[in-house]
Amino acid sequence: MQANSVPEFGYIPGGTVNDVARSLGIPNNIRGALKVILTGKNVLLDCMKINDRYAMYIVAAGAFTSATYTTPQAQKKLVGRVAYGIEGIRNNLKFDVFNVKIEGKDAVAESESVLVLFMNGKYVAGMGLNRHASMTDGKIEVAIVRQRPRPNFLHRVGAYFVLAKLFLLGYRVKERRIEKLEGSHFEVTAGEGVVWNFDGERGLSGKVVVDVLPGKVNMIVPARKKDF
């Protein structure tokens, strides 16, 4: 990220859900992706810097977020993204509650939470969670799913419905238990037990600083694609 010139990237999807490809309109098959590389256009996309690490489209902690790196590879190949749901339900039925404080330029949010998302892409886990967003606007969207410090059974059931609304209806859903922020710089305070997921891989734990790096990824995208 310190280079004077921005290297050019062609993208061939090889993952389970291929969220970046979905966001950019790149076909999931190799032949289609290669055609984009040969005939497409260049767009400078934003990415995120988290302390000294980087992520393209998602930084997350809490419910279901460990499923992407704990799901056995054989299970992924067998049932695809359904494997994430199976693994998530198996390991996260109770949804651990954790305290998080997020300080942005214009707002501060602090609460007990079951899920925190920093989103730069339109898709998360194969779902159009943030489909109205842009990967070229210099900002990211943050969603915090709040929970009581000591939730009872009904509170936990309620969390399932809130999470379902968020993933099915998207970031713009009106829900009082989902706090939302937007910006380009966030300082995040969380306990060391809070593990952050960077683009589907296990990342850092605890306190992090999340910054948007505008236009740092020079990606070849479909020539007719206009919305990034």
What are these model-predicted stretches?
Residues 2-117:
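Catalytic core of DAGKc-family lipid kinases
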Residues 18, 123-124, 194:
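Glycine-rich nucleotide phosphate-binding loop and flanking beta-alpha elements
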Residues 51-52, 137, 214:
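Residue-level signal for tight coil/turn positions that link beta-strands
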Residues 60, 64, 117-131, 202:
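Glycine-rich phosphate/pyrophosphate-binding beta-alpha loops
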Residues 75-83, 128, 132-154:
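Gly/Ser/Thr-rich active-site loops/lids in small-molecule metabolic enzymes
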